[in-house]
Amino acid sequence: VEWTDFERATIQDIFSKMDYEVVGPAALSRCLIVYPWTQRYFGSFGNLYNAAAIMGNPNVAKHGTIILHGLDRGVKNMDNIKETYAELSVLHSEKLHVDPDNFKLISDCLTVVVAAQFGKAFTGEVQAAFQKFMAVVVSALGRQYH
């Protein structure tokens, strides 16, 4: 993947301003609520009965934060994203048996949460850079499935 200077700077800027402990839980909660079939991968998380339960679930919040810290690894290794996520791809495909389409769903939910957080600063150009980064990460996570 080729990154422009603008894309690199934009991705680094977004992640430097993001509160992982707010954005991560919000994105994962949104995914579990909007796409309820994704809940099947989180059976050990306890009560996911309704939106309020999901948003108040400490296990969802913790895993949402873990997801953001995982994305931070990609930000720090933008020239080596496939290798950065090789082990996570194996884990999600071979051990957890996660449908790789779900990576795109969480990516879309994260984009919505980030856009809401950044407001007018999340311009079309910024969104394009963010979604390009997320598409590369989604591809890397799904790599083991191919």
Curated annotation (Swiss-Prot):
GO terms for biological process: hydrogen peroxide catabolic process. Pfam families: Globin. Heme b binds at residues 63, 92. InterPro entries: Globin, Globin-like_sf, Globin/Proto, Hemoglobin_b, Hemoglobin_oxygen_transport. Residues 2-146 form the Globin domain. One of its GO terms (molecular function) is organic acid binding. One of its GO terms (cellular component) is hemoglobin complex. Hb3 is a heterotetramer of two alpha-2 chains and two beta-2 chains. Involved in oxygen transport from gills to the various peripheral tissues. Hb3 displays pronounced Bohr and root effects, accompanied by strong organophosphate regulation. Belongs to the globin family. This is Hemoglobin subunit beta-2. It comes from Anarhichas minor. The gene is hbb2.
